[in-house]
């Protein structure tokens, strides 16, 4: 089930953060003084207020996501070959961490898919009801293999489901 965490301290401009199962979010003790940066492993939903002097950046192993005042979802599990970023509202800038660096900007109802093996980012239209279904406790599968369905069920419920 989704976990909504309350984070202490002065986080002006960082309104909401919700973490999905098997996810972690870290930040430095001086968050917000000069920079607003967090590190994410797993899946999280953010609502962030725009601040041009202190951009909000989500770092993952492969991508940096600069928030330009927005709400968005990031799916970045280490075991998965594809990362996904879905924009609910506002605007985000996505930049690869590898060289040569590539940049894409998302508009609402778009999502970026980053293939970790090829390093290719693609952008496509999406229905954000599906992208944020986990926030409501729902699981949605479309054209998904049985092994991927079982992997998500295992993650969600913290169980092992045998499959051959």
Region spans (language model):
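A residue-level detector for the "anchor" residue at the start of short, highly conserved motifs
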Residues: 1-164
């Amino acid at each position: 089930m989704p976990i909504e965490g309350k984070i202490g301290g002065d986080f002006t401009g960082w309104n909401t953060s919700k973490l999905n199962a098997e996810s972690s979010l870290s930040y430095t003790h001086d968050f917000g003084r000069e920079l607003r940066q967090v590190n994410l492993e797993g899946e999280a939903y953010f609502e962030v207020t725009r601040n041009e002097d202190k951009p909000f950046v989500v770092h993952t192993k492969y991508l940096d996501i600069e928030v330009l005042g927005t709400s968005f979802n990031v799916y970045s599990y280490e075991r998965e070959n594809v990362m996904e970023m879905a924009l609910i509202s506002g605007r985000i800038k996505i930049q690869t961490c590898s060289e040569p660096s590539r940049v894409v900007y998302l508009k609402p109802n778009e999502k970026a898919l980053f293939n970790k093996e090829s390093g290719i980012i693609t952008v496509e239209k999406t229905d954000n009801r599906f992208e944020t279904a986990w926030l409501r406790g729902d699981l949605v599968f479309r054209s998904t293999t049985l092994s991927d369905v079982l992997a998500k069920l295992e993650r969600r419920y913290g169980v092992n489901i045998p499959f051959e």
